[in-house]
């Protein structure tokens, strides 16, 4: 029986969160403001039959289907009703409810103010999203399960005018990097952490 590690419904994918996905996903590219569902399970291969259920049950598109060392990931998107119908079908196949998903745990969270040019350079070497600039504030957040990084990114983007530098939602832990003015970064950080704590 698969372990449901996350079951994340996003009612409206925010533009930067969506565009970041577009830099690496191999499936159907979502558009901003569509609904999305992210599912993480263990063992990883159990995501394959769940994908079959989701895409056959409703008119949704799959953007992510990844099996990595331990965990499997699926992201589907489309209209709200279709995404929720597909997600419900997946829960039915698992014999689970959304409440059975693992709760997010914040492992690390910090804000670095007045980012040094050297650190900005190093952060930007490893990113896919926007660039962190010297003098900006940088927020970094790490959590597990990893897929909760997309929820944190989406909620941070809703809350403040920030730049999404990077988020990693696959693996042992998830990570989020965002930058901007100190006030905006603090507001976004609070929104990201609150979104995770609300599920805890």
Outline where the language-model segments fall:
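Flexible, glycine/charged-enriched surface loops at secondary-structure junctions
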Residues: 60-68, 98-109, 162-170, 199-200
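Charge-rich, low-aromatic oligomerization/scaffolding segments with amphipathic character
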Residues: 82-95, 184-199
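Surface-exposed interaction/gating patches
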Residues: 122-165, 179-181
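Solvent-exposed alpha-helices and their adjacent loops that cap or buttress functional pockets
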Residues: 28-32, 55, 64-68, 130-133, ...
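Intrinsically disordered, low-complexity polar/charged tails and linkers
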Residues: 1-41, 45-48, 57, 103-128, ...
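Short amphipathic alpha-helix segments
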Residues: 44-58, 147-159
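Hydrophobic, ordered structural segments
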Residues: 75-110
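Short glycine-rich or small-residue beta-strand-to-loop segments that form or flank ligand, phosphate
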Residues: 33-42, 70-79, 136-142, 173-181
């Amino acid at each position: 029986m698969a372990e449901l590690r996350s079951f994340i419904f996003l009612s409206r994918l925010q533009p930067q969160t969506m565009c970041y996905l577009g830099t690496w996903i191999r499936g159907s590219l979502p558009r901003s403001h569509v609904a999305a569902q992210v599912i993480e399970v263990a063992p990883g291969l159990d995501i394959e039959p769940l994908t079959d259920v989701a895409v056959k049950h409703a008119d949704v598109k799959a953007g992510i289907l990844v099996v990595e060392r331990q965990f499997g990931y699926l992201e589907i998107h489309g209209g709200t009703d279709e995404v929720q119908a597909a997600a419900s079908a997946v829960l039915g196949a698992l014999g689970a409810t959304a409440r059975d998903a693992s709760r997010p745990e914040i492992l690390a969270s910090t804000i670095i103010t007045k980012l040094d040019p050297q650190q900005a350079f190093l952060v930007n070497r490893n990113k896919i999203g926007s660039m962190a600039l010297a003098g900006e504030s940088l927020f970094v957040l790490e959590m597990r399960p990893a897929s909760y990084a997309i929820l944190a990114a989406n909620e941070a983007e809703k809350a403040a005018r920030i730049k999404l530098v990077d988020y990693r939602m696959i693996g042992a832990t998830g990570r989020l990097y965002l930058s901007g003015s100190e006030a905006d970064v603090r507001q976004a950080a609070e929104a990201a952490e609150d979104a995770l704590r609300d599920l805890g």
